[in-house]
C-alpha cells in the first residue's frame, strides 16, 4: 500500500500538510511599509510546529503602507502563517498568524526578519517503500526515488529525486 504518514500503533498522523487552497483577497490599509509592490505567502502550521509548503500571490501594490487579507482559508487544528516579501517581491518573511478568515498588517519593513523556510517546497510525495538516511526520508514511487528536505520529513523539492530504469522494489539506505 501507499505510505503517507506515521503511527504509534494506536493513532496516525499524515506526514505532509496540504498547503492552503486559496490566497484570499488582498486589500490596502494604512501602515508603515515602504510604498511599492509586495507578494504575500500563506502556509498552514500544525500544533506540533510542522508547516506546509507556501502558496504565493502575484505582486500587490501597497500605496498606503499596509496589507489586509480577507476570505482566507481555514483548517481545524492549524493556524495560518502569513509571510510578506520585501519591497518589490524578494524573499518571504513572517508577518504573523491567524486562525480566522482575515489578517491585517501595517508594520515596518525592518520588522520582517523571520524567513519562510517552506518557500519553494512541495508536500512530500506518497510512495510504496520508505527509508531514512542522514536526516532525510526516502520514498519510492514506481521507478522514482524521492528525498525529503533535510530534517523536514514532510517537505520535498520538485528537483530532489533520482529516476531509475526499472521499478524500485526496496529502499535500504547504506552508509560507506
What are these model-predicted stretches?
Residues 1-135, 141-143, 158:
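Disordered, low-complexity "stalk" and linker segments at domain junctions of extracellular
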Residues 40, 44, 169-176:
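Conserved catalytic-core segments centered on acid/base and nucleophilic motifs
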Residues 127, 134, 166-168, 175:
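Conserved positions at the start
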Residues 140-160:
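Beta-propeller domains
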Residues 160-165, 172:
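Surface loop/turn motifs at the tips and blade-to-blade linkers of beta-strand repeat domains
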Amino acid at each position: 500500500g501507499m505510505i503517507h504518514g506515521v503511527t504509534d500503533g494506536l493513532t496516525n498522523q499524515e506526514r505532509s500538510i496540504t498547503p492552503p487552497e486559496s490566497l484570499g483577497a488582498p486589500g490596502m490599509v494604512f501602515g508603515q511599509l515602504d510604498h511599492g509592490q509586495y507578494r504575500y505567502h500563506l502556509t498552514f502550521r500544525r500544533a506540533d510546529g510542522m508547516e506546509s509548503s507556501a502558496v504565493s500571490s502575484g505582486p500587490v501594490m501597497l500605496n498606503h503602507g499596509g496589507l489586509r487579507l480577507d476570505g482566507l482559508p481555514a483548517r481545524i487544528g492549524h493556524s495560518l502563517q502569513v509571510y510578506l516579501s520585501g519591497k518589490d517581491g524578494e524573499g518571504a518573511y513572517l508577518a504573523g498568524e491567524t486562525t480566522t478568515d482575515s489578517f491585517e498588517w501595517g508594520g515596518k519593513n525592518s520588522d520582517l526578519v523571520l524567513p519562510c523556510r517552506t518557500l519553494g517546497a512541495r508536500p512530500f510525495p506518497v510512495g510504496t517503500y520508505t527509508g531514512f538516511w542522514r536526516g532525510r526520508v526516502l520514498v519510492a514511487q514506481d521507478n522514482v526515488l524521492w528525498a525529503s528536505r533535510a530534517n523536514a520529513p514532510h517537505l520535498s523539492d520538485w528537483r530532489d529525486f533520482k529516476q531509475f530504469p526499472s521499478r524500485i522494489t526496496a529502499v535500504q539506505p547504506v552508509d560507506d
